[in-house]
Curated annotation (Swiss-Prot):
It comes from Levilactobacillus brevis (strain ATCC 367 / BCRC 12310 / CIP 105137 / JCM 1170 / LMG 11437 / NCIMB 947 / NCTC 947). This is Energy-coupling factor transporter ATP-binding protein EcfA2. Residues 3-246 form the ABC transporter domain. It comes from the Bacteria. The lineage of its organism: Bacteria, Bacillati, Bacillota, Bacilli, Lactobacillales. One of its GO terms (cellular component) is ATP-binding cassette (ABC) transporter complex.
Length: 290
C-alpha cells in the first residue's frame, strides 16, 4: 500500500493553554511495497508521525492517504476500522501487550476480534508462529514463560495475524541483544521481500537504516528536515551531527581509512559494502605488485 502525508500538522491538546505542536507541515510519500526509515533525536516527532498511519492520532490539519483510505481531522472512527485491518503497528516492547493464557490464543485474538471464525483464527495463529520462526511446540505454552525475544516474536505474530499490508515498527529491536536485533531485522526484511509489505521503521540504529531502508526521513522538532535515500541522507556527517545524529559505523570506519590514504568509489554505509571495497583495494594492490 502506498502512503502519502500531505501538509500534516498535529497539535496535542489543541485549543487549550497546554497546546503543543508536535508535527508541522509534514509531506512525504512512500511507494507501495516501499521501506521507509524515520530517524531523529528523542522528541523530534517520530512516534507522533507514525501514530497518524492508523489514526491513533488524527491530524490537526492536512491529509494522510493510504491507498484508497484518506485520514483527515474529520474522519470518523467508524470509517477507520477497515484501515486498521491493513496497518499493523508494532510498538516498543510489544511483549507488554500479551495477555492470553496461551501463545495460540494471543495470536488469534486480533483476527477473532475482527470477525474471523475461531477455527480459522487458530489455524492462522499456527501459520504466523512459523512465519516468526517459532515451531508449533510454542502454541499451547503460556506467553509469560517465554524468553524476552520469544515473547516479542509472539507479539509480532499477533500483528501479522491481522494480515496487514503496511507494517509500522516503532523501535522494534529495543532491549534486544545484537543477535536478537539482527534476527528481528532479517524477519522484517523477509516479510518486506516475500510478502510485499510496506514497511515504516522508527529506529535509532543507523546500521539498520543503511542495511534495509530504501527511503529515510529525518525529523527535527516536528519538521521533516531531509528525505531521500540512505546514501543521500548519510552524505553529510556534519549536518547529521548538528541534528544529533550520526552516520553508520561502517561509514565512520571508512572515514578513518580515508584519512590514512585509502580511497572509496562511493561512501560505504554497511559492513558488507566496506568489506567489498577493501577486498577490491587489496586485490588491486596485489595486481600492482605482480
Amino acid at each position: 500500500m502506498a502512503i502519502a502525508f500531505e501538509h500534516v500538522t498535529y497539535t496535542y491538546q489543541a485549543g487549550t493553554p497546554m497546546a503543543h505542536t508536535a508535527l508541522t507541515d509534514v509531506s512525504l510519500t512512500v511507494p507501495d511495497r516501499g521501506y521507509l526509515a524515520i530517524i531523529g533525536h528523542t522528541g523530534s516527532g517520530k512516534s507522533t508521525l507514525i501514530q497518524q498511519l492508523n489514526a491513533l492520532l488524527k491530524p490537526t490539519s492536512g491529509t494522510i492517504k493510504i491507498d484508497e483510505f484518506t485520514i483527515t481531522p474529520e474522519t470518523t472512527n467508524a470509517a477507520l476500522k477497515p484501515l486498521r485491518q491493513h496497518v499493523g503497528m508494532v510498538f516498543q516492547f510489544p511483549e507488554n501487550q500479551l495477555f492470553e493464557e496461551t501463545v495460540r490464543q494471543d495470536i488469534a485474538f486480533g483476527p477473532k476480534n475482527f470477525g474471523m471464525a475461531d477455527a480459522d483464527a487458530l489455524a492462522l495463529a499456527d501459520e504466523m508462529l512459523t512465519t516468526v520462526g517459532l515451531d508449533q511446540s510454542y502454541a499451547e505454552r503460556s506467553p509469560f514463560e517465554l524468553s524476552g525475544g520469544q515473547m516479542r516474536r509472539v507479539a509480532i505474530a499477533g500483528v501479522l495475524a491481522m494480515q496487514p499490508k503496511v507494517l509500522v515498527l516503532d523501535e522494534p529491536t529495543a532491549g534486544l541483544d545484537p543477535q536478537g536485533r539482527q534476527e528481528m531485522m532479517r524477519l522484517f526484511a523477509r516479510l518486506h521481500q516475500e510478502q510485499g509489505l510496506t514497511i515504516v521503521l522508527v529506529t535509532h540504529q543507523m546500521e539498520d537504516v543503511a542495511q534495509y531502508a530504501e527511503q529515510v526521513a529525518v525529523m527535527h522538532e516536528g519538521r521533516l528536515m531531509k528525505f531521500g535515500t540512505p546514501a543521500d541522507v548519510f552524505s553529510n556527517r556534519e549536518w547529521l551531527q548538528d541534528h544529533q545524529l550520526d552516520v553508520p559505523q561502517a561509514a565512520q570506519f571508512a572515514r578513518r581509512l580515508r584519512d590514512r590514504g585509502l580511497t572509496f568509489p562511493k561512501q560505504p554505509l554497511t559492513a558488507d559494502q566496506l568489506a567489498d571495497y577493501l577486498a577490491q583495494q587489496w586485490a588491486q594492490r596485489g595486481a600492482d605488485h605482480v
